[in-house]
Amino acid sequence: MSSQGSPSVALSTTTVSSVAVQAGDSKIVIAVIKCGKWVQLQLAESQPNLLEIGSSQDETKKLLHDHELLLAKLKALEDRVWELLQEADKTAEENKDQSQVYDAMAETLGEAWAALVSMLERRTELLRLTSEFFENALEFAIKIDQAEDFLQNTHEFESAESLKSLLQLHEHHTKELLERSLALLNKSQQLTDFIEKFKCEGPNVNPELTQGAHSSCLKVDRLLELLQDRRRQLDKYLKQQWQELSQVLQICQWDQQENQVTCWFQKTIRNLQEQSLGSSLSDNEDRIHKQEELIIKAKEWNSAVEKLKSEALRILLSKDYVEKEHLQLSHQKLSQLQEEFGQLMVERNTWLKKANEFFNSANKAFDVLGRVEAYLKLLKSEGLSLAVLAVRHEELHRKIKDCTTDALQKGQTLISQVDSCSSQVSGIHEMMGCIKRRVDHLTEQCSAHKEYALKKQQLTASVEGYLRKVEMSIQKISPVLSNAMDVGSTRSESEKILNKYLELDIQAKETSHELEAAAKTMMEKNEFVSDEMVSLSSKARWLAEELNLFGQSIDYRSQVLQTYVAFLKSSEEVEMQFQSLKEFYETEIPQKEQDDAKAKHCSDSAEKQWQLFLKKSFITQDLGLEFLNLINMAKENEILDVKNEVYLMKNTMENQKAEREELSLLRLAWQLKATESKPGKQQWAAFKEQLKKTSHNLKLLQEALMPVSALDLGGSLQFILDLRQKWNDMKPQFQQLNDEVQYIMKESEELTGRGAPVKEKSQQLKDLIHFHQKQKERIQDYEDILYKVVQFHQVKEELGRLIKSRELEFVEQPKELGDAHDVQIHLRCSQEKQARVDHLHRLALSLGVDIISSVQRPHCSNVSAKNLQQQLELLEEDSMKWRAKAEEYGRTLSRSVEYCAMRDEINELKDSFKDIKKKFNNLKFNYTKKNEKSRNLKALKYQIQQVDMYAEKMQALKRKMEKVSNKTSDSFLNYPSDKVNVLLEVMKDLQKHVDDFDKVVTDYKKNLDLTEHFQEVIEECHFWYEDASATVVRVGKYSTECKTKEAVKILHQQFNKFIAPSVPQQEERIQEATDLAQHLYGLEEGQKYIEKIVTKHKEVLESVTELCESLTELEEKLKQGDVLKMNPNLEDFHYDYIDLLKEPAKNKQTIFNEERNKGQVQVADLLGINGTGEERLPQDLKVSTDKEGGVQDLLLPEDMLSGEEYECVSPDDISLPPLPGSPESPLAPSDMEVEEPVSSSLSLHISSYGVQAGTSSPGDAQESVLPPPVAFADACNDKRETFSSHFERPYLQFKAEPPLTSRGFVEKSTALHRISAEHPESMMSEVHERALQQHPQAQGGLLETREKMHADNNFTKTQDRLHASSDAFSGLRFQSGTSRGYQRQMVPREEIKSTSAKSSVVSLADQAPNFSRLLSNVTVMEGSPVTLEVEVTGFPEPTLTWYKKGQKLSADGHLQVLHKETRHSVFIPKVCKADAGLYVARAQNSSGALSSNVILHVTGNCRLPITRVNWITLCVVYVSVSLMYWLLTQ
């Protein structure tokens, strides 16, 4: 059926029927609604709502199940619906007129049913979709639970792999969570979209559906939000744990990589440490190749290390990572390992290269050793001598050493560098062992040079041993022979002396044997020729000559002594024989004939004794003559004075001669008695026989004298000695003949008396007597001539021997380059020989002349003296020639001595120069190696002193050299030796070196002087910086207290007056320092030295600029009355400048109240000194008339501003030294003009030692004493000294309470106080100049102190200062009107003038007392300690006495009077009210007296501090009044 149209009018809707379907908890009610011709089905009720989805999966499943049952039941009614529709069709067919209605109803009913079924099916789909959603949500929740369990469970991992698995699980859970979340989101979106679509289907929107849709969507959203919250939270924890695990994994992986890299490095390092450098060249080259490959591989590992290090650095720099300490340690370990590996690689490369060089050298060495070995085999076959073989072997040994030294040295160096016990050098050890074994083998084969050297050494040692023994023996003999010999006064003494000389002779002969053995050894081993052997040979010759001289002296002395002893002994024997024979002849009676046999025996015995006596007597006579001859030939000083012995000997010889004659007469008488008993005829017959025999013997004697008469006096000595020996043998015969003649003469006389015919024999007897007398005279003449001839020839022979030895010396040139002592000895020996030769010459000539004169006698006419005369003439001629040669030789030796002495002097100069140069270089080196801190000005000055000392030494050396040079040129003008040129060359070379070194010393000294000047300039710069900085700080601090524009303006002007002229001077100093630094250290290094100065200068200029700007700004602000706002800024400015001074005082101790009190005393001293003058106002700055009213009373001229007007003075800052003319200083520079009168009523009478505070009445007077100008200069300089010393010395720390300031806060004693509490020189320069102009006598002390300060910045003084607080100077006030000025008590000007005059004329030996530190008024709190100190100088040392209120002070339990050097003080540990009053220190000596006064004020402890508000209020009031006054006066 179908509907043809819709009614045109509104039709009513009627519920035809309703159908209820229920399945479980689900129930729907369907209403059949009719509206006109339409019939529709309407869901009237649904439980639950069609869009209700349930709260859980189970509930949804139940809803789905019930809904499916419901739908099944509903579908079961579908047939009935279709049946109804069929019935409707039938009815429509039956009712044609209603067919249209029925068709419409059928159509709408079918559509409604289909729609209803579709709706219910959609619900089924919704529930299924919801079920799927809840299923996904459940899976998502389960996954979340699993992930939570995963997070909550503790996971252990043993390796990075397990950690990776854990991270994978993390990723897996995260991924699944995301997947489940995404699926759930998609499903929820799908479900939500489905609900929204379901809700909006149909022409009308059902509110219930809308509400159900909203409820279902809300459930979905809540569940989804809950799960997503859990997921997000879980995801956060998962991410956090994953991040942590990732970090751990990253660190683990880093550790793994680090372990891998470390293992590789450690393994490689072990290999590098253990691997050998090779055992051969090829092995070494292979290892070098492997090393190159390792270098390439190491680059890769190093890149890995760098990546690890960068990763580690990234991790360390990251804030998210934990446990960084392990990583940091590993990073450091890895860096160290890499560094160690790099060092080992470098070392390994170096060692491999050195090993390669070693093996190359070893191969070259083996090649050379092979050639040496072949050459050694060739030498063995040649059979060379030891000397030649030694030379060849020595060359080979040198070649062996040269070729192996390089290899062994390289190997040893390599072993020492690596490690001698390391396995790396095992191959080096083996190769070196091979080389050494090969060298040892070849060295054993080529040992001829060692054998040769050993033998030569043995020979040298042997010869040296011989010569040493010879020298020792000569040293023992020399002292004995150097003294003259004493022959002794007795025989025993002479025998002792003889034995001593015989021992010396034996010793000399043994020494001679030693010397001969040495000479023989050198002669036999002449193949071992060397410089040492030549020297020993020369030494042996000298020793032989000296020993020869000693031997000759010993032989001569021994001969003299032997002759003398033999003479004495023989004389004694002769005397004994004489006495025996004399007794015999006097007492013995000749026997008669019956005793012929006995008489004959007695006569024969007496005759034998007589003959022995004659022989011994003549021998004694010969010994005496020989002794006298030896004495005549003795050298000068050879024998002690023997005049007495000679005299005794001659007497003995004369006595023996007389004894012979006496005994001869006794014998003759005895013989005559013996013949008396014979008959006359028998006597006559015997007489004739005796006469005949005697005549015959005389003829024989004449024949025996013929050889002597024909003697050639110029013959040989041996012939003459033989002749003399024969003559001596004939002397007994001469005596016998003489006795026979005497006997004949006596017997003839007796026979004549008996009547015998003697007359017939008288002629014969006369002839016999005459002939005998003639022969006797001839014998005497011949004996004299023979004795002199023998003596002459002996002297001549000795002279010839000496001349021959001297000629050999003349041929040899003296050792000009020998030791001066040896040459001196040689000269002395030569002179002794010369004197000996001259003596022998004179003796020979004297003997020759005597002999020739003796020959002139008549009995000697046959003796030939012609040859002797020729010999004398030749001897005279040779003597002259030889003397000339000897003199020339002596001059040569003298020149040699001079040459050696000059050479020694030059060598001494060279040694002195070397010593000076060495010590100077050591001085330079020791100074150079000092650090910059040690090379301070003091060390530099000491270095300059040392250099000056060496410069003086050099000048002294040059003077000595000049003297030696002049002496050389004067002494060796005609010296023929070329050695003089050598000396001159040496002298010239030494002069050149000395000049060069003198230039070095001079340049070094100039350099040191420049360095000293440079350091002084630097110190002056630093001093200016400190001065300027302190001034900036002080002015900045003063500016914080300034309350008026005029005060700031004056302060600014005063500051400019101080700083403006000093800046150009400082820049000149900097420029000078720059030039000096560049000159001393070069451009770049010099710039480094000067950078700090320039930087500091800029900082100071910047601080000055900032200060000026601040002062200008402050002045502008004060114009606008903006004082209160500026003060804090200025205080900040003030403390900014404190920082400027902290750098130079960085390491210094802080200064406590004692330092500040010290500063107060110093300022009080300055005020006391300056305040005694009369003030004079400049004419252009006078204050005008009463027009200015009250301001007139407050303003002073620019150069002399009063403290009352200038409200800048703080009780804390009263210790600061004021600038010249600054607001704090109550004195102008013109105040030094003491003699000027008071110029204006505005002049302020300011106390010499302090200003009374606050409420001081006019009656409270301040006492003052004007010190002499020298004291003023000393005081000023004292401030400078202590200023500089503050930066140089540490301070003792004291416990002190800082005083309360007028601004209500405690001022700490910082470095600012240390600097500002002193008085720099530059800040008082103008005052100093004016003071010196007015008082020239002060200039010397001031300059002296200034120089002392600049010379030694370390000078300090004892810090015994006043223990007083600064409350005494709580402000500076001046009363107006007639009571404005403070009263002063001053020393009369006459006393001042007299003191000054005395000071100016007293010399150093007589100086009047002078206070270099004056007393100053002090205000202290009761119970505080205080020290009143004064320093006095003068000569003689002044005695200082303390007075209090006119009474002399002495030490007691309450106070102490102290004295140390020039400082005198009174120390009161606890001050009480009774201690207040006037104290006077009076110094007196023989040149004058001087006093200094101080007033001690004692205040109570209850004084309230002046707060900052009071000052500010006062300032505001003051400015307000000033402005009102200005407005009113306009």
Curated annotation (Swiss-Prot):
Its main location: cytoplasm. It is found in: Cytoplasm; Cytoplasm, Cytoskeleton, Microtubule organizing center, Centrosome. Ubiquitinated and degradated by the CDC20-APC/C pathway. During brain development, CDC20-APC/C complex degrades CCDC141 after centrosome translocation into the dilated area. CCDC141 is restabilized in the dilation until the centrosome enters the dilation, at which point it is once again immediately destabilized by CDC20-APC/C complex. The oscillatory regulation of CCDC141 protein is needed for proper cortical migration. The keyword Ubl conjugation applies. Residues 1210-1241 are annotated as: Disordered. SMART domains: IG, IGc2. It comes from the Eukaryota. Residues 1409-1530 form the Ig-like domain. Plays a critical role in cortical radial and GnRH neurons migration during brain development. Regulates cortical radial migration by negatively controlling the activity of histone deacetylase 6 (HDAC6) and promotes centrosome maturation. CAMDI is required for dilation formation of cortical neurons during radial migration. Plays a critical role in learning and memory performance through regulation of AMPA-selective glutamate receptors (AMPARs) cell surface expression in competition with KIBRA. Interacts with DISC1. Interacts preferentially with phosphorylated forms of myosin regulatory light chain (MRLC). Interacts (via the N-terminal region) with HDAC6; inhibits the deacetylase activity of HDAC6. Interacts with KIBRA (via the C-terminal region); retains AMPAR in the cytosol after internalization. This is Coiled-coil domain-containing protein 141. It comes from Homo sapiens. The gene is CCDC141.
